[in-house]
Amino acid sequence: MEIPKSLPKKELFTFLEKNLNRIIADKKANMKKADAFSFGFFPVDKEGLTEKANKPVTEDVDEITVRAIINTTNLMDSHDDVHIPGLWNKSLKENKDIWHDQEHKHEFASTIAEGKGLKPYVKTYTWKELGQKWEGETQALVFDSTISKDGNNPFMFNQYKQGRVKNHSVGMNYVKVEMAINDKDYKDEFKTWNKYIDQVANKEQVEEQGYFFAVTEAKVIEGSAVKRGSNWVTPTEDNNLKSEPPEGTPQEPEKSTQLTSDEIINTIKKHFK
């Protein structure tokens, strides 16, 4: 259902409340492709340390490991949706059939990594660690993928090896969605608004619009390398995070606070000595 955003706010809010069930049903009906996250990936070396983001792998190797940031939370996207931290927890615990694909194509030849070659988990970053001016945090959906030259997709092996992959996007199904409206006349929706609004990074944009949809649970189907994305968040392209693959239920690795790229690198090096 198309939302008539040109209506005066009070009429728009009335429309949203009246059609709430249908709007949310539409959002949950089919697999959604989120706005792409423009970050690229971290190559991971044999010691489990990440290199500079998007750095080409110059060695003649048959296998590489990359860390791809697939999705982030606490940001209203082009669908008026805000992914809430924790939305992936149930899915990551229960669903072991997750793929790292090329451009959301669910085909054998498009598979980049799966099974034992893919470790999906969540990790909390500050927005400053991702090169943004905002205070606060975002919980990222992260894929650690082992990609083989002789695997299903040698083309994407070479794209990652040459540092050409700049964008990723998650393919998912929404499970739980709440509507938030900034108007006390809509009791339940106003309560949802007050619960989440202060954690939204682009808060001013959301306040100007007056409503959003809080996605509190979603099922991960796949994460894809995509050629071009519409997400306008572009994090810093330098980091030195140590790879510690999660055991059991995916948990959030420890985070550190960044002021500059040099400071974060030095802090993390000290942390992992």
Placement of each model-derived feature along the sequence:
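Terminal short linear interaction segments
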Residues: 251-273
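Signature of dsDNA virion morphogenesis modules
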Residues: 1-244
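Long, low-complexity intrinsically disordered segments
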Residues: 241-254
